[in-house]
């Protein structure tokens, strides 16, 4: 685990974004942990989050021309990542996002920001079922651009209905990498090292044994 990954997990726990206990997921599974990126909900938290995304962008080595934030949750994530890449890594890159509804006045269309062209890095919080990413791929294709990869905050590393995770299905179907700031593997490492949170380790390990990939 890299230093920025450890710092991100600590930050997510401090903000209440990553919590341990008993949670019912949309899938119906009872999970021993829950991740809600919507709780990075202050200016300072968003600025810091962008720096973690930027670190993961650099770490991934993915070659791309433009950042894309899918509506709605991906919009502030792409914006703060673009700011952090420029300020922390001297990489001033274009970014854009889509609207869910097309406008018939002003700039029109469903895309806002820089042109969606060349190699596109998609920025989002998590991939649950992969439905949102499939919609994004249609937007990218329609612009004649191509997806270079996807960056998310957390990879839960768990199976969907079949043997693969939604992330593995996206990688297989579109031939592109999906990378994350951290995965469940790093969360487990963090729990091992943290005296106070170690008590949650057996439940998380049992969950991974049942649903992990």
Swiss-Prot record:
The keyword Glycosyltransferase applies. InterPro entries: OPRT (IPR023031), Or_phspho_trans_dom (IPR004467), PRibTrfase_dom (IPR000836), PRTase-like (IPR029057). GO terms for biological process: 'de novo' pyrimidine nucleobase biosynthetic process; 'de novo' UMP biosynthetic process; pyrimidine ribonucleoside biosynthetic process. 5-phospho-alpha-D-ribose 1-diphosphate binds at residues 26, 72-73, 99-100, 103, 105, 124-132. Pathway: Pyrimidine metabolism; UMP biosynthesis via de novo pathway; UMP from orotate: step 1/2. Its cofactor is Mg(2+). This is Orotate phosphoribosyltransferase.
């Amino acid at each position: 685990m890299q230093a920025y990954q450890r710092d991100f997990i600590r930050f997510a726990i401090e903000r209440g974004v990553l919590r341990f206990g008993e949670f019912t997921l949309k899938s119906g599974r009872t999970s021993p942990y829950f991740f809600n990126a919507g709780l990075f909900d202050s200016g300072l938290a968003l600025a810091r989050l962008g720096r973690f995304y930027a670190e993961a962008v650099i770490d991934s080595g993915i070659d791309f021309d433009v950042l894309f934030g899918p509506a709605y949750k991906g919009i502030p994530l792409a914006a703060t990542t673009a700011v952090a890449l420029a300020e922390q890594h001297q990489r001033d890159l274009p970014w854009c996002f889509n609207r869910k509804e097309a406008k018939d006045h002003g700039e029109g269309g469903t895309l806002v920001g820089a042109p969606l062209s060349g190699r596109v890095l998609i920025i989002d919080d998590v991939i649950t079922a992969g439905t949102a990413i499939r919609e994004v791929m249609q937007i990218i294709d329609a612009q004649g651009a191509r997806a270079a990869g996807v960056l998310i905050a957390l990879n839960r590393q768990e199976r969907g209905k079949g043997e693969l995770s939604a992330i593995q299905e996206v990688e297989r179907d579109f031939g592109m990498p999906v990378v994350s700031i951290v995965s469940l593997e790093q969360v487990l490492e963090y729990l091992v090292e943290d005296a106070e949170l170690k008590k949650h380790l057996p439940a998380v390990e049992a969950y991974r044994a049942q649903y992990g990939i």
